[in-house]
Amino acid sequence: MAPARKGKAKEEQAVVSLGPQAKEGELIFGVAHIFASFNDTFVHITDISGRETIVRVTGGMKVKADRDESSPYAAMLAAQDVADRCKQLGINALHIKLRATGGTRTKTPGPGAQSALRALARAGMKIGRIEDVTPIPSDCTRRKGGRRGRRL
């Protein structure tokens, strides 16, 4: 057995490709699930089927103060992080599914929804379809607050 020489060993590196294989200029779509409540904003990217999570960042991961988790600034930082990760993986276009809390609670998206969507577009991601997927009750349990409502 011959002794190994220093600095002479040949290392073969396998080319590792993350994400789908695509031609130049071809759009590779993912789905951006943006959940904007009045307490936090989630930006969650999945593959086109929605089964495989690619990246998920929240507003609370980007700011220190609890009161700032749902702010437009935190949502913008989260969306920029998500866009960078998507570009690394080869995803260059997104379908948007925007969601508010819904159900018996508010059906209005929180303050971070619009800024997260705008930050994704400004980061160079192509936007496909935008859909509101807030859960709307057809007929459901009684809303919190009692018969006479919330008294201030």
From Swiss-Prot:
Pfam families: Ribosomal_S11 (PF00411)
Any one biological process term the GO annotation gives: ribosomal small subunit assembly
Subcellular location, principal: cytoplasm
GO cellular component terms, A-Z: cytosolic small ribosomal subunit; nucleolus; small-subunit processome
Gene Ontology MF term list: structural constituent of ribosome
Location in or out of the cell: Cytoplasm; Nucleus, Nucleolus
Classification via Gene3D superfamilies: Ribosomal protein S11 (3.30.420.80)
Keywords, sorted A to Z: Cytoplasm, Nucleus, Ribonucleoprotein, Ribosomal protein
InterPro entries: Ribosomal_uS11 (IPR001971), Ribosomal_uS11_CS (IPR018102), Ribosomal_uS11_sf (IPR036967)
Family per similarity comment: Belongs to the universal ribosomal protein uS11 family.
Quaternary assembly: Component of the small ribosomal subunit. Part of the small subunit (SSU) processome, composed of more than 70 proteins and the RNA chaperone small nucleolar RNA (snoRNA) U3.
Role summary: Component of the small ribosomal subunit. The ribosome is a large ribonucleoprotein complex responsible for the synthesis of proteins in the cell. Part of the small subunit (SSU) processome, first precursor of the small eukaryotic ribosomal subunit. During the assembly of the SSU processome in the nucleolus, many ribosome biogenesis factors, an RNA chaperone and ribosomal proteins associate with the nascent pre-rRNA and work in concert to generate RNA folding, modifications, rearrangements and cleavage as well as targeted degradation of pre-ribosomal RNA by the RNA exosome.
Protein name: Small ribosomal subunit protein uS11
Biological source species: Caenorhabditis elegans
